[in-house]
Amino acid sequence: MHQHRRTSSAVASPVSSPHPSSSRPITRDRGTARFGPNVSRGLGIDRQMDASDQEQTIESPEKSPSQKLDQIIQNYHTKAALVILHSRVDLSPATYHGVIRTNKWFNVEVNETEDLKDSLGVWKYSNCTDSRPPPLIIEVYLDLTQLTNNQSLVIIDDSGKRWDVVEALATYGCLDNSRTSKSGVILERWRIDLGPGPDDLPLDMGSILPTVYKKSIVVFRSLYAYSKLLPAWKYSKRHSKIRPNPALSLKYRILQGPGGQIRSTNDPLTVPLHPGNGPVVDTYSFGVTDSPAGPLSALVTYRTNCDFRVDDSEALLSSRFMGVDERFFKPSLPSEDNFAAAGQEHGSLPVQKRDVGRPDLGQAYGSMSTFHQVGATTGASPISALRAARELAAGSPSSPTRPSHSPRPSQAGRVAALSGEGNHLIQRRPSISIQPFKAPPLSASPALVDSPVGSQPKNSAPRVGPMDITSSARQMPPPHGTPTTSRRSAHVSESAIASSTSGSPRPAPISKYSSSFSHRRGRLSSGGASKTDDDNNSSGRVSVSSSTVHPGSGTSADPATTSSGSLQADEDNISDFLKMLEMGKDLLSRKDSKSLDKNTKRTSAALSRFQKMRDSNAVLSDSMSSSLLLQPSSISSSKQLPNAATSVAGASISVSSSPGKAISPHTQHIPAVPSRLSSNSVVDYSHSHEDRHERRHRLSHESRRSPSEERANDEPRLKRDESTANAIDIPTSPRPFIPSFRRSSSAAQRRSSPPVEDDLGDFLPFGMRSLSLGAEDRSTLSLSELVRQQESSVPASDTNALQQQNQKDTRTGQSIVDESPSRIDNVPGTSSPRQYQPRFAHGRGRGSFGHPQPHVSAASSLGRASPIPNVTDADREGYIGSGNNGGTAVPPDTRRGSSHRFSFNRHLGTPANMDEDEPLLFAMSDFGASRRSLEEGRKGATTAGADHGGAPSTELQPAAETRSEGGPPSVSRGRYRAWP
């Protein structure tokens, strides 16, 4: 790049050469001497020159100014060709004695090559007077002749679409069928030109030539740099790193001016190869350098897009058949409605072809885990589908901007929404359908889509499904019995069921969404949980408070209550999550039953049936959970009754320490059930339904046994009751307003089962009683019970008078048989444990207790009792005055405080409704209607005396009573007379 310092040496005789540049005259002209040493380095033409010629001294023969001008013009063309082609193609270097020769003209060093000797001969031997050099045209192109029959050269446009280059050139007439005319695709065209000059050369060229040379240095430096910035250079470097197809290798050709170029009607360089708005070619000029022979210029015209590749012709043809490379093969997205931005399943079948009408969900039938209906299944659980159908039929207000769309089942196959965008037409999978049994039936219907984010229980069918929402979707290993928190909330028409931690193995909650709320699951709740908790912590049961639209349920919901600004263009996953939460608010509004049509009523009835079945499953789980949670606390906080000979049915009953709350069907209770590990602290569920008939039959014969014989028979029975306790009594579905109605209750309100009722009936003079009932609704005392009660305290002289009074009442009255349950007084919360005692003293050595404490605790855990058994005269003789309270009388005003009538009932015969004699676990506030219906039916029943020798019951009113010192009141002789 720098001029070499010349050293003086002996004058060497010039070597004869036919070329005019072979002789260098010796001159001291500084202007001409500067060009002398470099004249012999031109494209390897002077191969005969010795290496010593390169260090020729000033004393060599001097050239004329015209010869120096010819050298500048010749090297201007040849050096430009070397710079351009060295950056595009690989040229073989020229060597001399094993040394690569370098061309240093215009202070730019490039390697000499023998490849351009013949192509550049015209410009090497030209001069500015006799043979002016023609314009030098250099074209860089792609050779199409290198393509095979099954290959096509294509160009990729800015949008990534492929275009056939040969077809584009043929369209503009640049190619014909002859093989020789397929010159290729021109990428660049360089033009080096010497413009026209004066007829006569100026006389002072010696001072002008150094300026021309210096200006040319600037031009060649620009040419060297700019040639490496054009698209063709980038293309060549990209394909030089790999083994390219021969058709993709850059080729060049050197042409002489316009007259020497073979071209067709249209210029192949400017023909557009693909449609587009941008320019096809661009031009850059390196400026003009003035010289005595004329202006020297360099110009390049190049294609702006050089992204070429070779593809298989068959693949390119197939692409055209499919819509010219997906031009007409677009996803089936709606373009005429407001849901164009929402994600939808892509496929070759249009949406209209895949439309499936929604079947009538009200006509569907099946079990809790199967759902049979006409049409394709939507993957919904029965409860969620019925609930959604009822809510839609109720006429929820719809959004003014978006109509409610009917659901369409998603197609199992291609993933519906790869980015997790929600759509009203495509729903996510629901929570686990109800499985009341350990193993699901074989007909369990799988859902069509999956979630994302979450795990899948082992008993659920596999799902073909989309990926996740904002995270990679994947099948995670199912949980193995992980205890989780079950949450459920109360429906408007049902009382709340308290939630608790489940102690039984249960599938882990399925997370519908990967959100920041996932760490909040696992909390206990005393009441109904929110809908969000229910959805995020579902443990396998469909909750009452679940949203109207269950993901994947196939039932669309009304988006009226969603936020107004995110209904149309919101494609975010979190917005869909919030929309689903807002849609659930429709469940909080009460519906007018008059507005529901006939189909809606059938749907509601089916929904109620499923909800009752759900409660049976829920009560079992909650009871087991509560028994584990409440077992340690019940021992320390409750009052334990002695488990001795005076214990009730061989089990101790815990008494609540938090009285004062009325019993109501809408009261929340903490569930508790007996356990094998806690038989000493909870009521025993030990007797079956068949034992109840045996005990009732045995009651009629107990009056004829002696007290000692009766005690001997009771002891083994009590031991048997303790040893044969069942672990869990699974409750049945709730049936309102019948004696066998059972529901989940708190630990303090858990009542004994019917077998316990029979055992307590041995000494308790009354059955279960609803606290909400008034005293005036109590049943009257039967005659046989009054006889036994009074004979225990009335002397023999007064017995005859009482019997005569009873016989008189028998002729005029009728016995009233009351099998409905009644309630006993609360066990007083004293520090020492007490056994349960009847209100009035009677036989079998059990004293009465009658604390003057009214019924104030609705949460007290009290046992239910049946009517008292028959007592013989022998029992009465040794019985008078016995008991804890010494046979004292009980004032009637201490019993519920509002009535002087005592509630005694007795019926030793088999009741008419034996299938419905199971007592309530807790009394209901609205039991009055059922009570009155039972009273009406009681009038037509046979009297107890007709079957067992008793007399018809007669209502008696209490007379004066006495109170013994140190004990509660008791009934004394002659305290009862016929009620007027």
Curated annotation (Swiss-Prot):
Amino acid composition bias (Low complexity), ranges on this chain: 8-23, 396-410, 493-504, 538-549, 654-665, 738-753, 940-951
CC terms in the record's Gene Ontology section: Atg1/ULK1 kinase complex; cytosol; phagophore assembly site
Major location (coarse): cytoplasm
One Pfam family matching this protein: ATG13
Region named Disordered: 1-68, 344-364, 391-415, 436-569, 654-763, 786-917, 931-980
Basic and acidic residues compositional bias, start-end: 700-723
Composition bias type Polar residues, residue spans: 54-68, 553-567, 786-817
Manganese as UniProt keyword: no
One GO process term, biological-process aspect: protein transport
Keywords, ordered alphabetically: Autophagy, Cytoplasm, Protein transport, Transport
Coiled-coil boundaries: none
Compartments in which it is found: Cytoplasm; Preautophagosomal structure
Job of this protein: Activates the ATG1 kinase in a nutritional condition dependent manner through the TOR pathway, leading to autophagy. Also involved in cytoplasm to vacuole transport (Cvt) and more specifically in Cvt vesicle formation. Seems to play a role in the switching machinery regulating the conversion between the Cvt pathway and autophagy. Finally, ATG13 is also required for glycogen storage during stationary phase.
Subunit structure: Interacts with ATG1 to form the ATG1-ATG13 kinase complex.
Matching PANTHER family: AUTOPHAGY-RELATED PROTEIN 13, PTHR13430
Family: Belongs to the ATG13 family. Fungi subfamily.
Official protein name in the record: Autophagy-related protein 13
Organism annotation: Coccidioides immitis (strain RS) (Valley fever fungus)
Name of encoding gene: ATG13
